[in-house]
UniProtKB/Swiss-Prot annotation:
The keyword RNA-binding does not apply. The keyword Nucleotide-binding applies. Pfam families: GatB_N, GatB_Yqey. It comes from Limosilactobacillus fermentum (strain NBRC 3956 / LMG 18251). Coiled coil: none annotated. This is Aspartyl/glutamyl-tRNA(Asn/Gln) amidotransferase subunit B. Its EC number is 6.3.5.-. HAMAP family: GatB (MF_00121). NCBIfam families: gatB (TIGR00133), PRK05477.1-1 (NF004011), PRK05477.1-2 (NF004012), PRK05477.1-4 (NF004014). GO terms for biological process: glutaminyl-tRNAGln biosynthesis via transamidation; translation. It comes from the Bacteria. It catalyses: L-glutamyl-tRNA(Gln) + L-glutamine + ATP + H2O = L-glutaminyl-tRNA(Gln) + L-glutamate + ADP + phosphate + H(+); L-aspartyl-tRNA(Asn) + L-glutamine + ATP + H2O = L-asparaginyl-tRNA(Asn) + L-glutamate + ADP + phosphate + 2 H(+). Belongs to the GatB/GatE family. GatB subfamily.
Amino acid sequence: MNFETTIGLEVHVELKTNSKIFSPSPVNFGAAPNANTNVIDWGYPGVLPSINKGVVRDGIMAALALHAEVTKKMHFDRKNYFYPDNPKAYQITQSETPIAHDGWVEIEVDGKKKKIGIKEMHIEEDAGKNTHTGSYSYVDLNRQGTPLIEIVSKADIASPEEAVAYLEALRQRIQFTGISDVKMEEGSMRVDTNISVRPYGSDQYGTKTEMKNINSFNFVKNALNFEADRHQKVLMAGGEIVQETRRYDEATKGTVAMRTKEGSDDYRYFPEPDLPPLEVDDAWIEEIRSQMPEMPGERRRRYVNDLGLTDYDAMVLTQTKEMADFFEEAVKDGGDAKKVANYLMNDVNSYLNNQHVDLDDTKLTPANLAGMIKLIDDGTISSKMAKKVFQGILDGQEPAAFAKANGLVQLSDPAELQPIIDAILDDNEQSIEDFKNGKDRAFGFLIGQIMKKTQGKANPKVVNQLLGKSLNER
């Protein structure tokens, strides 16, 4: 029997606001435990939340970036559950009236494009974090109340590969808005997956299983592949799939059952009584739309049409906002667009991958990369010498100063080169004769002698011109 897979994804994106969604506590990554908290975060009796307008604005911007319809009238709901990292015993979220609905993103897998629908988007508060050490458990509420957008896809995803492509497209568009850095390693993007399988041609979905808080695209792919295979084996053996929440195990690349999946009734949703309904008007939505930054597709078209890049180069440069911004700054600083693109896609990307860092974590600046490229273009340094200069600018060194201090500047002045060429010719009369007799190797030999004498610093283009002229005059 052949099966088809159906996947839905719930993505939680942490917003880059200065304060939390319902309290004035600051939001920053890496603070001391419980440093960024107040009585609202701790759930003290009698304290009241108030909505952060910036969170609503960012939610609307995310909706516009994902082609979603903004809800004009909405309210918040309480999702009731008890857990140590949730001192109020409920989460303020949106159940009945999400901030946006019916969006989409386009993906491409194996050369085929496909639109993946977005069912709805919610703004809500995050929970705290539990840490277990030995026989002790600790609760850190720094994350409690951090604003989130939950983005719920439609069940349009048919394979783990499509799931990863969807997540990449989602992360890219959210990142370009600037409302979140969507760094999975810091928890600002977390993924819950839902997967089921059914016989090909069936119009009924199979029983789904959920996996929560997966923190890398590779793990998402592995987990979905494992679950799809597990579902099929259970059904082929005549068994039944249990609707449950499972955990991805990095060591085994498999999944482990955690608990029976809860339904919405278990959470006893009801409207949040401490917050009034929220209404947004068309004027504010249009104001936010006018402030939308250029999206990846728009940048790609501009790079191709205005800067002469290939479609492939434009696609690679717009994979992340930091790379695209760096590229544009380097071009503004005078770097040739195609050469800047080549360095970023090759030398810079290779360095980032080897060091396991992001571009923002390095000392490399757009001005220094552009400056190095200009030194190559004007003949100050050779392409070979540029490899050493590149190491210098990775360390934050100014390219011209680094080249001069390390003896990497080419000899291009004819007044300096001509005496060297004359001396080489005086010592190689036979090579002069060979050249005049049509032996081209002689010219290459003489070039080699000149480069050896200058320790590779002579400008090859200038040397070629001067040597040719000198040979013709002898």
